[in-house]
Amino acid sequence: MRKAVLTILFLVWAVLGSFADGIAITHGPYLQNVGESEATFVWVANKPSIGWVELAPDDGTNYYAVERPKFFDTTNGVKNTSTLHSVKVKGLKPGTNYRYRVYVTEVLSHKSWVVTYGRTDALDVFYGQPPMFRTNDTKKGETSFAVVNDIHARVGDITKLMNVANYKQKDMVIFNGDMLSNLTSEEQIFTGFMDESIKLFAKEKPLYYVRGNHETRGEYATMCQKYFSPKEPHLYYMFSQGPVCFIMLDTGEDKPDTDLEYSGITDYDNYRNEQAEWLAQVVKSEEYCRAKWHVVVGHIPPRPVKDMWHGQYEVLRKFVPILNEAKVDVMLCGHLHRHIINQPDNEVKFPVVVNSLDHVISGWTEGQNLHLDMYDTKGTLVEKFTVKAK
């Protein structure tokens, strides 16, 4: 009898243990690279798994009303077995709300053509509402955004600055680099800033990420694009919302590639050469040319000139000549950990707004004006800056 009881208890413990240690979505989902007709979803599971996202229109129906279309995390037609999942969905309509749900199914083994699956986890849409996002719309009359940079894992400042900028009313949020001091692990990305961002807004509000010079450092640095712009060709890119075309530059490191601090692992001078070639082409594109406003976002500024480091010289030499010809309205930067506004001159023919590490830029268009208000964590207005349409 005692042996039978012990056997039953062991089986119960084993079953409960398997449930407790089952597949689960541990981070995310969050949005990346939302455009007029596409959006990318990123999320993390605790076990190797296949993943997919379901999409549903915001049409008033219950999420369970019909089977929703599925979009799988794949590479060349094969579903990826991974803990990190990303899916880019195309064919969406501009200025349209969509609900979504992400899933993971554990892969217990994959031998030859035989795959054994475990349990499935998904976002809860039974007791809660599925997250909802809105695609961009270049026909939208106005737009708004919030920009922070140089957070360096000060998680509490994210919430303060987002609230100060009234983030719930903004179309998008932009992270302009150095959200961490270096990249050493996946967990660091989430505990350092992304978990808080997901809790606040990133499930439903577009987040656009610009790499800073500190995300280029650490043993996990080459994994950066697995989490940010994971389905794009590069970490530099362009997108439009309302009357604004945004160019997001990756300004690389701030010191020469040969500096001892980099241990011979960097090649940013050539990387910026390639990026300059791309930049020269996109500023001639129809999307760029038809936009009313042109905003460049890059971590390292080309100003001020005094005591300029190598990275700033590179931005000034390789990017600024192209941007001068492209009639840029303003460039938003960080990196210097202080608030500076450089007015246009003969060398840089557009204003450069350098945002401090503990400030947020609250930006919005209004007719012929592009407003940029800078606030600190206490909500104190640091400076108002307005750019007039050209």
Predicted regions and their residues:
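Active-site-proximal segments of metal-dependent phosphoesterases and phosphodiesterases across multiple
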Residues: 262-264, 268, 286-331
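Positively charged n-region of N-terminal signal peptides that target proteins for export
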Residues: 1-4
